[in-house]
Amino acid sequence: MQHIDYLNLKDINSPLQQDILDAIHQVVESGWYLQGKANQQFAEAYAQYIGTQYCIPCGNGLDALKLMLRGEMELGRLHEGDEIIVPANTYIATILAITECRLKPILVEPRWETLQIDDRLLHQVLTPLSLIHI
């Protein structure tokens, strides 16, 4: 039986290898692994690319989700106890971000065909406290 690589990152990254190594070298040489020049340049370029004024680089998805939810709370759009609808097959970071912000995750089973929330089930979970779907 022939082996087929799931995601051959070596082949994918091969054309960019020297650029990647150069970028890593520049960051290591600068001594700024967090909040350095490369981070600032990325944030500015990404904000421009997606058409927004600001970009906040995060170390992981959990931190990004918490910042988003806390921002919505600071703006008064979310309040402790509000419900956030998520697919039951979501990654644990989604649930952790919601609960750390004292919000309530509402898990909805996904459709087998798409692995996305089964919209036919939403009427069973929607309440006046259901405000966001992640």
Please report, for each region that a protein language model flagged, where it lies by residue.
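Pocket-edge positions in alpha/beta enzyme catalytic cores
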Residues: I12, G31-L34, L107-E109, T114
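N-terminal "arm"/small-domain region of PLP-dependent enzymes with the aminotransferase-like
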Residues: M1-W32
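Phosphate-binding glycine-rich loop
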Residues: W32, K37-E83, A97-C101, L107
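Small/polar loops that bind or transfer phosphate-bearing groups
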Residues: N8, P57, V86
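PLP-dependent aminotransferase-like
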Residues: M73-I132
